[in-house]
Amino acid sequence: MKRHYLWMFAAIMICGATVLTSCSEDDNPSQPEQPENGYSASTQELITLVNSNAQLKSLLEKAIAKGVEINPDRETNPAQTLSEYYDFIEWAAHAMPWSVVTQPEGTDIFTRIDQSLNYFFFINDIPLDELDGQTLYNNSLQYFEPYRTWLKTFAKAWGAYLDTEDSWNQAYYDIVAKEDTFGISKGWYEDASNWKTFNQFFARKLSSPAVRPIASPEDNSVVVSPADACTQGVWQIDEDGYIVQDDEVGVQVKSKKFSSIAELVGPNSQYRDAFNGGTLTHSFLNVYDYHRYHFPMAGKVKEANLIEADYAVGGTITWNPKTKKYDLFCDTPGWQSIETRGCVILDTPDYGVVALLPIGMMPVTSVNWAPEVKVGAEVTKGQELGHFLFGGSDFVILFQSGISFTLKPQLFSHQLMGEELGRLD
């Protein structure tokens, strides 16, 4: 099923160099000028890589050229040459998420961010025949070294900018405050004076636990939503530890490796095989959502690992000529095993061990634990587990064999953290 995810606006960072937008100056009042001595470090690093690697240069030029064939419109596909691509990523490293790609006047922020984000990965996710048969997640440039590593460099550079006070001001606050989807006017969040940077806004705290009541807090058979997020479904895990996928659902992962629960849980976990024959469910956070995640059940922390991996789109991007928009397909699980992520193993009294995996996505891909999350800690349902910084985000829960999980909300419906996600038997 096609899903447009604003949260992916994280990826916008890559998207945005010299693209002129339909936004007013107030939308991005402190737009940085290009340095007098040339490009910034992350852009210059890519230029150096391309100039020293003929294969990389050929692949990047081919991806850009194929993008022009698919969508020649300069307003929605502005980087149509290699030099224009350099300018584009230079701009993106200091751009606000809503000020990158031209959109019709009056377009809401959700769409502006969504399309800007998706655009960058449209180029990076274009299939290239030259990369067939290399056991990559797919045959696109974002998984090809050294471009893959450069994406991490770029993401960290943009994340550093979003941690500066240049990334937040009253004008930016006014932009998000007028959008009902962000919920700023609902009294959910801490005082806005606490936000000095964009990332402080993005990882905003609740004003009180009362604004996110926890369903059946003493009953561990009631699993609550770990975040404000849209439910994506429930999948069985076979006895060999692979996700069972319907061939007719979404875009299928080509290699069985990427459906491996052991790969998802991570190389350093003692519980890599603990979920064979079990169940997987995951929920997707949108960009406007509350980006702190909480324990969906009570228990004891057995492991808490951070797994450094790719800074990739998480799914597949296509251009829809009818709607003139970029579409992201990411419902089908498997891509989570390639993303930078966290994994907490929670030992519950009656339902075995449960794996909790916050999944970071491009571009900043920042997964963070709350200070209290340590091995041996006893935690309560609804207690804060951690937070994402700017970027796309997903949350996966794994249950062991013999534990029956029934999803309560309608598929793809939006839940608030603490609402009932499902029941265990």
Model regions and ranges:
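N-terminal leader/targeting segments
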Residues: R3, C15, R112-S116
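Bacterial Sec-dependent N-terminal signal peptides
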Residues: K2-Y5, G16-N37
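Contiguous, well-folded functional domains in the mature portion of proteins
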Residues: Q34-D425
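Hydrophobic helical h-region of N-terminal Sec-dependent signal peptides
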Residues: F9-I14
